[in-house]
From Swiss-Prot:
GO biological process terms on file: chaperone cofactor-dependent protein refolding
UniProt-recorded Gene Ontology molecular function terms: ATP binding; metal ion binding; protein folding chaperone; protein-folding chaperone binding; unfolded protein binding
Gene3D superfamilies: GroES chaperonin
Compartment(s) where it occurs, according to its Swiss-Prot or TrEMBL record: Cytoplasm
Protein name: Co-chaperonin GroES
SUPFAM superfamilies on file: GroES-like
InterPro entries: Chaperonin_GroES (IPR020818), Chaperonin_GroES_sf (IPR037124), Chaprnonin_Cpn10_CS (IPR018369), GroES-like_sf (IPR011032)
GO cellular component entries: cytoplasm
Name of a matching Pfam family: Cpn10
Similarity comment: Belongs to the GroES chaperonin family.
Signal peptide: none
Principal subcellular localisation of the protein: cytoplasm
């Protein structure tokens, strides 16, 4: 199944983070914080402005992004994989390089 977000929404695959502390202690799944990085897998058509025009999104499929800890509260399961759906304005930065 393919997910196509609407308007200014973005679908993100959360990155897998290491579940070890700097000291080498392995954290159980419940103690580890969810990573706040991911890869954009789908983008909507753009944000609808007050004058009716559509502004294209600044992120594109394949971008590695950073988002806030409470961003992407909408999680959907597609083909057994949990994906986040969030508005573009919830993305804090694009990781380059």
């Amino acid at each position: 199944m393919k997910l196509r977000p609407l308007h200014d929404r973005v679908v993100i695959r959360r990155s897998e983070e290491e579940s070890k502390t700097a000291g080498g202690i392995v954290l159980p799944g419940s103690a580890a914080e969810k990573p706040n990085r991911g890869e954009v897998v789908a983008v909507g058509t753009g944000r609808i402005l007050d004058n009716g025009e559509v502004r294209a999104l600044a992120v594109k499929v394949g971008d590695k992004v950073v988002f806030g800890p409470y961003s992407g509260s909408n999680t959907v399961k597609v083909d057994g994989e949990d994906l986040l759906v969030m508005s573009e304005n919830e993305i804090l930065a694009v990781v380059e390089g």
